[in-house]
Protein backbone atom coordinates (compact mmCIF):
# COMPACT_ATOMS: atom_id res chain seq x y z
CA UNK A 1 0.00 0.00 0.00
CA UNK A 2 1.32 3.42 -0.94
CA UNK A 3 2.13 5.80 1.91
CA UNK A 4 1.52 8.80 -0.32
CA UNK A 5 -1.11 11.07 1.27
CA UNK A 6 -4.31 11.54 -0.72
CA UNK A 7 -4.59 14.64 -2.88
CA UNK A 8 -6.89 17.14 -1.22
CA UNK A 9 -10.12 17.87 -3.05
CA UNK A 10 -10.19 21.06 -5.10
CA UNK A 11 -12.24 23.67 -3.29
CA UNK A 12 -15.53 24.62 -4.90
CA UNK A 13 -15.50 27.82 -6.88
CA UNK A 14 -17.00 30.82 -5.17
CA UNK A 15 -19.87 32.65 -6.89
CA UNK A 16 -17.55 35.57 -7.67
CA UNK A 17 -14.94 33.22 -9.12
CA UNK A 18 -17.54 31.42 -11.22
CA UNK A 19 -18.87 34.72 -12.52
CA UNK A 20 -15.39 35.96 -13.42
CA UNK A 21 -14.46 32.72 -15.16
CA UNK A 22 -17.75 32.69 -17.08
CA UNK A 23 -17.22 36.29 -18.19
CA UNK A 24 -13.70 35.54 -19.43
CA UNK A 25 -14.89 32.47 -21.33
CA UNK A 26 -17.73 34.47 -22.87
CA UNK A 27 -15.30 37.23 -23.85
CA UNK A 28 -13.04 34.65 -25.50
CA UNK A 29 -15.98 33.26 -27.49
CA UNK A 30 -17.06 36.71 -28.67
CA UNK A 31 -13.56 37.84 -29.59
CA UNK A 32 -12.87 34.59 -31.45
CA UNK A 33 -16.14 34.86 -33.36
CA UNK A 34 -15.61 38.47 -34.44
CA UNK A 35 -11.96 37.82 -35.28
CA UNK A 36 -12.84 34.85 -37.50
CA UNK A 37 -15.54 36.86 -39.26
CA UNK A 38 -13.18 39.78 -39.77
CA UNK A 39 -10.46 37.60 -41.28
CA UNK A 40 -12.83 35.90 -43.72
CA UNK A 41 -14.55 39.17 -44.66
CA UNK A 42 -11.18 40.89 -45.10
CA UNK A 43 -9.92 38.16 -47.44
CA UNK A 44 -13.12 38.35 -49.47
CA UNK A 45 -13.00 42.13 -49.76
CA UNK A 46 -9.32 42.02 -50.67
CA UNK A 47 -10.05 39.51 -53.43
CA UNK A 48 -12.90 41.73 -54.63
CA UNK A 49 -10.58 44.74 -54.89
CA UNK A 50 -11.96 46.69 -51.94
CA UNK A 51 -8.46 47.23 -50.58
CA UNK A 52 -8.09 50.02 -53.15
CA UNK A 53 -10.99 52.02 -51.72
CA UNK A 54 -9.80 55.49 -50.68
CA UNK A 55 -9.72 55.33 -46.89
CA UNK A 56 -12.79 53.14 -46.67
CA UNK A 57 -11.57 49.56 -46.31
CA UNK A 58 -11.95 49.45 -42.53
CA UNK A 59 -15.47 50.86 -42.70
CA UNK A 60 -16.48 48.43 -45.45
CA UNK A 61 -15.00 45.53 -43.48
CA UNK A 62 -17.01 46.52 -40.40
CA UNK A 63 -20.15 46.87 -42.53
CA UNK A 64 -19.72 43.37 -43.98
CA UNK A 65 -19.38 41.86 -40.50
CA UNK A 66 -22.45 43.79 -39.34
CA UNK A 67 -24.44 42.52 -42.34
CA UNK A 68 -23.24 38.97 -41.65
CA UNK A 69 -24.94 39.08 -38.26
CA UNK A 70 -28.20 40.35 -39.72
CA UNK A 71 -27.49 44.04 -39.21
CA UNK A 72 -28.99 46.72 -41.42
CA UNK A 73 -26.71 48.92 -43.49
CA UNK A 74 -28.37 51.88 -45.21
CA UNK A 75 -27.02 53.39 -48.42
CA UNK A 76 -27.35 57.11 -49.07
CA UNK A 77 -26.29 59.57 -51.72
CA UNK A 78 -25.97 63.28 -52.34
CA UNK A 79 -25.69 64.93 -55.73
CA UNK A 80 -26.77 68.42 -54.82
CA UNK A 81 -29.93 70.13 -56.02
CA UNK A 82 -29.54 68.96 -59.62
CA UNK A 83 -29.75 65.23 -59.02
CA UNK A 84 -31.02 62.59 -56.66
CA UNK A 85 -29.82 59.16 -55.66
CA UNK A 86 -31.74 56.05 -54.74
CA UNK A 87 -29.94 53.17 -53.02
CA UNK A 88 -30.87 50.03 -51.12
CA UNK A 89 -28.93 46.96 -49.99
CA UNK A 90 -30.23 43.84 -48.26
CA UNK A 91 -27.95 40.80 -48.22
CA UNK A 92 -26.03 38.51 -45.89
CA UNK A 93 -22.48 37.40 -46.76
CA UNK A 94 -23.15 33.86 -45.60
CA UNK A 95 -19.56 32.63 -45.65
CA UNK A 96 -18.76 35.23 -43.00
CA UNK A 97 -21.97 34.34 -41.17
CA UNK A 98 -21.25 30.61 -41.18
CA UNK A 99 -17.65 30.95 -40.00
CA UNK A 100 -18.66 33.29 -37.20
CA UNK A 101 -21.47 30.99 -36.07
CA UNK A 102 -19.24 27.89 -36.05
CA UNK A 103 -16.41 29.55 -34.14
CA UNK A 104 -18.66 31.30 -31.61
CA UNK A 105 -20.75 28.17 -31.03
CA UNK A 106 -17.66 26.01 -30.55
CA UNK A 107 -16.08 28.42 -28.08
CA UNK A 108 -19.38 28.70 -26.19
CA UNK A 109 -19.66 24.92 -25.79
CA UNK A 110 -16.00 24.15 -25.11
CA UNK A 111 -16.02 24.98 -21.36
CA UNK A 112 -18.98 22.59 -20.91
CA UNK A 113 -17.43 19.57 -22.61
CA UNK A 114 -16.49 17.77 -19.37
CA UNK A 115 -19.88 18.25 -17.69
CA UNK A 116 -22.44 15.45 -17.64
CA UNK A 117 -25.28 17.86 -16.93
CA UNK A 118 -25.44 21.57 -16.31
CA UNK A 119 -27.76 23.70 -14.28
CA UNK A 120 -30.23 25.98 -15.99
CA UNK A 121 -28.87 28.99 -14.09
CA UNK A 122 -25.29 28.30 -15.16
CA UNK A 123 -26.33 27.82 -18.78
CA UNK A 124 -28.34 31.04 -18.75
CA UNK A 125 -25.43 32.88 -17.14
CA UNK A 126 -23.03 31.69 -19.83
CA UNK A 127 -25.45 32.46 -22.65
CA UNK A 128 -26.36 35.85 -21.20
CA UNK A 129 -22.70 36.83 -20.89
CA UNK A 130 -22.05 35.94 -24.54
CA UNK A 131 -25.15 37.84 -25.69
CA UNK A 132 -24.30 41.02 -23.79
CA UNK A 133 -20.69 41.07 -24.96
CA UNK A 134 -21.74 40.26 -28.52
CA UNK A 135 -24.13 43.21 -28.63
CA UNK A 136 -21.47 45.52 -27.21
CA UNK A 137 -19.09 44.44 -29.96
CA UNK A 138 -21.81 44.86 -32.58
CA UNK A 139 -22.51 48.40 -31.40
CA UNK A 140 -18.82 49.21 -31.71
CA UNK A 141 -18.67 47.83 -35.24
CA UNK A 142 -21.78 49.81 -36.15
CA UNK A 143 -20.03 53.01 -35.13
CA UNK A 144 -17.11 52.18 -37.46
CA UNK A 145 -19.27 51.04 -40.39
CA UNK A 146 -19.89 54.41 -42.04
CA UNK A 147 -18.20 56.08 -44.98
CA UNK A 148 -18.83 58.28 -48.04
CA UNK A 149 -17.36 57.84 -51.50
CA UNK A 150 -17.22 60.39 -54.27
CA UNK A 151 -18.67 59.35 -57.65
CA UNK A 152 -16.87 60.40 -60.81
CA UNK A 153 -19.54 60.74 -63.49
CA UNK A 154 -17.74 62.34 -66.41
CA UNK A 155 -15.02 60.75 -68.51
CA UNK A 156 -16.55 57.28 -68.68
CA UNK A 157 -16.72 55.01 -71.67
CA UNK A 158 -20.46 54.38 -71.51
CA UNK A 159 -22.58 55.95 -74.23
CA UNK A 160 -25.39 57.41 -72.13
CA UNK A 161 -26.98 60.64 -73.45
CA UNK A 162 -27.81 61.85 -69.96
CA UNK A 163 -24.30 61.04 -68.83
CA UNK A 164 -22.79 63.08 -71.67
CA UNK A 165 -25.17 65.98 -71.02
CA UNK A 166 -24.88 66.25 -67.25
CA UNK A 167 -21.61 64.49 -66.42
CA UNK A 168 -19.37 67.52 -66.10
CA UNK A 169 -22.05 69.47 -64.26
CA UNK A 170 -22.52 66.67 -61.71
CA UNK A 171 -18.79 66.31 -61.20
CA UNK A 172 -18.68 69.97 -60.25
CA UNK A 173 -21.03 69.36 -57.29
CA UNK A 174 -19.12 66.25 -56.12
CA UNK A 175 -21.87 63.59 -56.03
CA UNK A 176 -21.30 61.05 -53.28
CA UNK A 177 -22.69 57.74 -52.11
CA UNK A 178 -22.21 56.42 -48.62
CA UNK A 179 -23.42 53.90 -46.10
CA UNK A 180 -24.43 53.99 -42.46
CA UNK A 181 -25.54 51.38 -39.96
CA UNK A 182 -29.04 51.64 -38.56
CA UNK A 183 -28.21 50.89 -34.93
CA UNK A 184 -31.67 49.93 -33.63
CA UNK A 185 -32.52 47.21 -36.20
CA UNK A 186 -28.88 46.08 -36.18
CA UNK A 187 -28.91 45.38 -32.44
CA UNK A 188 -32.33 43.72 -32.66
CA UNK A 189 -31.38 41.37 -35.49
CA UNK A 190 -27.97 40.86 -33.93
CA UNK A 191 -29.70 39.73 -30.73
CA UNK A 192 -31.81 37.24 -32.68
CA UNK A 193 -28.69 36.06 -34.52
CA UNK A 194 -26.57 35.34 -31.46
CA UNK A 195 -29.49 33.70 -29.62
CA UNK A 196 -30.07 31.50 -32.66
CA UNK A 197 -26.40 30.57 -32.85
CA UNK A 198 -26.27 29.53 -29.18
CA UNK A 199 -29.53 27.57 -29.43
CA UNK A 200 -28.44 25.75 -32.58
CA UNK A 201 -25.06 25.00 -31.00
CA UNK A 202 -26.81 23.28 -28.10
CA UNK A 203 -29.13 21.39 -30.46
CA UNK A 204 -26.50 20.04 -32.84
CA UNK A 205 -23.86 19.16 -30.25
CA UNK A 206 -23.77 15.50 -29.29
CA UNK A 207 -21.80 16.06 -26.09
CA UNK A 208 -22.82 19.41 -24.66
CA UNK A 209 -24.68 18.98 -21.36
CA UNK A 210 -28.26 20.08 -20.91
CA UNK A 211 -30.25 20.94 -17.79
CA UNK A 212 -31.77 17.83 -16.23
CA UNK A 213 -35.28 18.83 -17.28
CA UNK A 214 -34.25 18.91 -20.96
CA UNK A 215 -32.23 15.70 -21.08
CA UNK A 216 -35.26 13.70 -22.25
CA UNK A 217 -35.39 15.79 -25.44
CA UNK A 218 -31.80 14.95 -26.31
CA UNK A 219 -32.42 11.65 -28.11
CA UNK A 220 -35.27 12.76 -30.41
CA UNK A 221 -33.75 16.14 -31.32
CA UNK A 222 -29.97 16.03 -31.42
CA UNK A 223 -29.36 13.25 -34.00
CA UNK A 224 -31.49 14.91 -36.69
CA UNK A 225 -30.28 18.42 -35.80
CA UNK A 226 -26.67 17.31 -36.10
CA UNK A 227 -27.45 15.59 -39.41
CA UNK A 228 -29.00 18.76 -40.83
CA UNK A 229 -25.89 20.74 -39.90
CA UNK A 230 -23.78 18.13 -41.68
CA UNK A 231 -26.04 18.45 -44.73
CA UNK A 232 -25.55 22.23 -44.94
CA UNK A 233 -21.80 21.90 -44.39
CA UNK A 234 -21.60 19.16 -47.04
CA UNK A 235 -23.13 21.50 -49.59
CA UNK A 236 -20.65 24.21 -48.64
CA UNK A 237 -17.77 21.73 -48.95
CA UNK A 238 -18.93 20.60 -52.40
CA UNK A 239 -19.25 24.22 -53.47
CA UNK A 240 -15.77 24.96 -52.14
CA UNK A 241 -14.26 22.13 -54.20
CA UNK A 242 -16.08 23.31 -57.32
CA UNK A 243 -14.99 26.89 -56.68
CA UNK A 244 -11.33 25.91 -56.29
CA UNK A 245 -11.48 23.96 -59.55
CA UNK A 246 -13.03 26.96 -61.30
CA UNK A 247 -10.39 29.29 -59.86
CA UNK A 248 -7.61 26.99 -61.07
CA UNK A 249 -8.95 26.31 -64.56
CA UNK A 250 -10.67 29.53 -65.62
CA UNK A 251 -9.80 33.18 -65.69
CA UNK A 252 -10.30 35.85 -63.00
CA UNK A 253 -9.50 33.71 -59.93
CA UNK A 254 -9.75 36.78 -57.67
CA UNK A 255 -13.47 37.08 -58.42
CA UNK A 256 -13.96 33.40 -57.63
CA UNK A 257 -12.16 33.71 -54.30
CA UNK A 258 -14.23 36.78 -53.47
CA UNK A 259 -17.36 34.67 -53.88
CA UNK A 260 -15.87 31.81 -51.84
CA UNK A 261 -14.91 34.08 -48.94
CA UNK A 262 -18.11 36.14 -48.94
CA UNK A 263 -21.08 34.32 -50.43
CA UNK A 264 -20.44 30.60 -50.95
CA UNK A 265 -23.41 29.37 -48.86
CA UNK A 266 -25.63 31.89 -50.66
CA UNK A 267 -25.06 29.80 -53.79
CA UNK A 268 -24.80 26.29 -52.37
CA UNK A 269 -27.90 26.52 -50.17
CA UNK A 270 -29.80 27.93 -53.13
CA UNK A 271 -28.57 24.86 -55.05
CA UNK A 272 -29.96 22.64 -52.27
CA UNK A 273 -33.36 24.32 -52.47
CA UNK A 274 -33.44 24.15 -56.27
CA UNK A 275 -32.30 20.53 -56.15
CA UNK A 276 -35.34 19.47 -54.13
CA UNK A 277 -37.65 21.29 -56.55
CA UNK A 278 -37.83 24.74 -54.97
CA UNK A 279 -37.62 28.02 -56.85
CA UNK A 280 -36.37 31.58 -56.48
CA UNK A 281 -37.32 34.67 -58.44
CA UNK A 282 -35.30 37.71 -59.33
CA UNK A 283 -33.66 39.90 -61.90
CA UNK A 284 -30.35 41.58 -62.63
CA UNK A 285 -30.21 44.87 -64.49
CA UNK A 286 -27.53 47.43 -65.12
CA UNK A 287 -23.76 47.20 -65.27
CA UNK A 288 -23.37 45.29 -62.04
CA UNK A 289 -24.77 41.94 -61.08
CA UNK A 290 -24.56 39.19 -58.53
CA UNK A 291 -21.18 37.51 -57.97
CA UNK A 292 -22.65 34.17 -59.01
CA UNK A 293 -22.03 31.53 -61.68
CA UNK A 294 -22.73 32.69 -65.20
CA UNK A 295 -25.63 30.26 -65.55
CA UNK A 296 -27.52 31.97 -62.69
CA UNK A 297 -26.69 35.45 -63.95
CA UNK A 298 -28.01 34.49 -67.40
CA UNK A 299 -31.30 33.28 -65.91
CA UNK A 300 -31.72 36.44 -63.83
CA UNK A 301 -31.22 38.61 -66.90
CA UNK A 302 -33.56 36.49 -69.01
CA UNK A 303 -36.92 37.74 -67.73
CA UNK A 304 -38.81 34.43 -67.80
CA UNK A 305 -41.12 35.13 -64.92
CA UNK A 306 -44.45 34.20 -66.47
CA UNK A 307 -47.14 36.65 -65.41
CA UNK A 308 -44.51 38.93 -63.88
CA UNK A 309 -42.46 39.42 -67.01
CA UNK A 310 -39.93 41.62 -65.22
CA UNK A 311 -38.87 38.72 -62.98
CA UNK A 312 -37.06 35.51 -63.86
CA UNK A 313 -37.82 32.19 -62.21
CA UNK A 314 -34.78 30.29 -60.96
CA UNK A 315 -35.51 26.57 -60.80
CA UNK A 316 -34.19 23.32 -62.23
CA UNK A 317 -35.78 23.77 -65.63
CA UNK A 318 -34.65 27.38 -66.15
CA UNK A 319 -31.09 26.58 -65.06
CA UNK A 320 -31.00 23.45 -67.23
CA UNK A 321 -32.14 25.53 -70.20
CA UNK A 322 -28.88 27.46 -69.84
CA UNK A 323 -26.69 24.45 -68.99
CA UNK A 324 -27.85 20.84 -68.99
CA UNK A 325 -25.48 19.99 -66.15
CA UNK A 326 -27.90 21.76 -63.79
CA UNK A 327 -29.97 18.55 -63.71
CA UNK A 328 -27.23 17.08 -61.51
CA UNK A 329 -28.60 19.20 -58.66
CA UNK A 330 -31.46 16.71 -58.32
CA UNK A 331 -29.44 13.49 -57.75
CA UNK A 332 -26.90 15.36 -55.61
CA UNK A 333 -29.73 16.55 -53.35
CA UNK A 334 -31.17 13.03 -53.16
CA UNK A 335 -27.83 11.48 -52.20
CA UNK A 336 -26.85 14.08 -49.61
CA UNK A 337 -30.28 14.29 -47.95
CA UNK A 338 -30.42 10.48 -47.81
CA UNK A 339 -26.94 10.42 -46.28
CA UNK A 340 -28.07 12.92 -43.64
CA UNK A 341 -31.16 10.83 -42.87
CA UNK A 342 -29.01 7.70 -42.57
CA UNK A 343 -26.54 9.46 -40.26
CA UNK A 344 -29.38 10.64 -38.03
CA UNK A 345 -30.88 7.13 -37.91
CA UNK A 346 -27.56 5.52 -36.98
CA UNK A 347 -27.12 7.97 -34.09
CA UNK A 348 -30.71 7.53 -32.89
CA UNK A 349 -31.62 4.88 -30.30
CA UNK A 350 -32.37 1.44 -31.75
CA UNK A 351 -35.90 1.57 -30.32
CA UNK A 352 -36.79 4.51 -32.61
CA UNK A 353 -39.53 3.44 -35.01
CA UNK A 354 -39.29 4.09 -38.73
CA UNK A 355 -42.25 6.44 -38.80
CA UNK A 356 -40.83 8.40 -35.88
CA UNK A 357 -37.51 8.82 -37.64
CA UNK A 358 -39.21 9.80 -40.91
CA UNK A 359 -41.31 12.42 -39.13
CA UNK A 360 -38.33 13.83 -37.23
CA UNK A 361 -36.25 14.01 -40.40
CA UNK A 362 -39.05 15.70 -42.32
CA UNK A 363 -39.65 18.32 -39.63
CA UNK A 364 -35.91 18.92 -39.16
CA UNK A 365 -35.31 19.35 -42.89
CA UNK A 366 -38.28 21.70 -43.21
CA UNK A 367 -37.03 23.84 -40.30
CA UNK A 368 -33.54 23.82 -41.80
CA UNK A 369 -34.79 25.21 -45.10
CA UNK A 370 -37.01 27.67 -43.23
CA UNK A 371 -33.75 29.16 -41.93
CA UNK A 372 -31.48 28.57 -44.93
CA UNK A 373 -33.76 29.78 -47.72
CA UNK A 374 -34.65 33.28 -46.41
CA UNK A 375 -31.03 34.20 -45.68
CA UNK A 376 -30.20 33.84 -49.40
CA UNK A 377 -32.32 36.94 -50.10
CA UNK A 378 -30.48 39.64 -52.02
CA UNK A 379 -31.85 43.09 -52.85
CA UNK A 380 -29.54 45.77 -54.20
CA UNK A 381 -30.56 48.94 -56.02
CA UNK A 382 -28.71 52.09 -56.96
CA UNK A 383 -29.70 54.90 -59.29
CA UNK A 384 -28.64 58.45 -60.04
CA UNK A 385 -31.37 60.59 -61.57
CA UNK A 386 -30.88 64.05 -63.03
CA UNK A 387 -33.53 66.74 -62.45
CA UNK A 388 -36.00 63.91 -61.86
CA UNK A 389 -36.22 63.11 -65.60
CA UNK A 390 -34.29 59.87 -65.81
CA UNK A 391 -31.66 57.56 -64.43
CA UNK A 392 -28.07 57.37 -65.64
CA UNK A 393 -27.85 53.76 -66.78
CA UNK A 394 -24.08 53.69 -66.39
CA UNK A 395 -24.43 54.42 -62.68
CA UNK A 396 -27.62 52.55 -61.90
CA UNK A 397 -28.74 48.99 -61.62
CA UNK A 398 -30.75 46.49 -59.65
CA UNK A 399 -30.18 42.99 -58.37
CA UNK A 400 -32.97 40.95 -56.82
CA UNK A 401 -33.02 37.32 -55.73
CA UNK A 402 -35.64 36.06 -53.31
CA UNK A 403 -36.91 32.57 -52.50
CA UNK A 404 -40.42 31.14 -52.54
CA UNK A 405 -39.90 30.21 -48.91
CA UNK A 406 -43.02 28.23 -48.08
CA UNK A 407 -42.86 26.17 -51.26
CA UNK A 408 -39.26 25.26 -50.42
CA UNK A 409 -40.22 24.39 -46.83
CA UNK A 410 -43.10 22.17 -48.00
CA UNK A 411 -40.87 20.32 -50.43
CA UNK A 412 -38.24 19.87 -47.71
CA UNK A 413 -40.87 18.33 -45.43
CA UNK A 414 -41.88 15.87 -48.16
CA UNK A 415 -38.29 14.97 -49.02
CA UNK A 416 -37.46 14.54 -45.34
CA UNK A 417 -40.39 12.19 -44.76
CA UNK A 418 -39.57 9.97 -47.75
CA UNK A 419 -35.79 9.90 -47.41
CA UNK A 420 -36.04 9.71 -43.62
CA UNK A 421 -38.02 6.49 -44.01
CA UNK A 422 -35.48 5.14 -46.50
CA UNK A 423 -32.56 6.20 -44.33
CA UNK A 424 -34.11 4.46 -41.33
CA UNK A 425 -34.50 1.26 -43.36
CA UNK A 426 -30.85 1.38 -44.39
CA UNK A 427 -29.75 2.06 -40.82
CA UNK A 428 -31.71 -0.96 -39.55
CA UNK A 429 -28.91 -3.13 -40.98
CA UNK A 430 -26.33 -1.29 -38.89
CA UNK A 431 -25.77 -1.77 -35.18
CA UNK A 432 -27.17 1.31 -33.51
CA UNK A 433 -27.08 3.11 -30.18
CA UNK A 434 -28.71 1.14 -27.37
CA UNK A 435 -28.89 -2.09 -29.34
CA UNK A 436 -28.02 -5.19 -27.29
CA UNK A 437 -26.93 -8.39 -28.96
CA UNK A 438 -29.21 -11.23 -27.82
CA UNK A 439 -27.62 -14.60 -26.84
CA UNK A 440 -28.36 -17.55 -29.11
CA UNK A 441 -29.86 -20.61 -27.39
CA UNK A 442 -29.62 -24.02 -29.02
CA UNK A 443 -32.05 -26.88 -28.61
CA UNK A 444 -29.49 -28.95 -26.66
CA UNK A 445 -29.36 -26.24 -24.02
CA UNK A 446 -25.90 -25.09 -24.94
CA UNK A 447 -25.33 -21.42 -25.09
CA UNK A 448 -22.93 -18.73 -24.13
CA UNK A 449 -21.30 -19.24 -20.73
CA UNK A 450 -22.94 -17.40 -17.88
CA UNK A 451 -21.26 -15.43 -15.14
CA UNK A 452 -19.15 -17.28 -12.57
CA UNK A 453 -21.28 -19.05 -9.98
CA UNK A 454 -24.39 -19.05 -12.13
CA UNK A 455 -26.39 -22.33 -12.04
Predicted stretch roles:
Residues 1-6:
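N-terminal acidic, proline/glycine-rich, low-complexity intrinsically disordered segments
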Residues 11-24, 102-127, 143-150, 195-227, ...:
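Cytoplasmic membrane-interface segments at the C-terminal ends of transmembrane helices
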Residues 11-99, 143-182, 243-333, 371-447:
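Long, glycine/tryptophan/cysteine-rich extracytoplasmic
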Residues 31-39, 130-142, 227-243, 367-368, ...:
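Selective recognition of specific alpha-helical transmembrane segments in multi-pass small-molecule
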Residues 90-102, 123-131:
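Elongated alpha-helical scaffolds
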Residues 179-195:
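Alpha-helical transmembrane segments
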Residues 214-255:
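A structural/positional concept
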Residues 447-455:
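Long, low-complexity, intrinsically disordered segments
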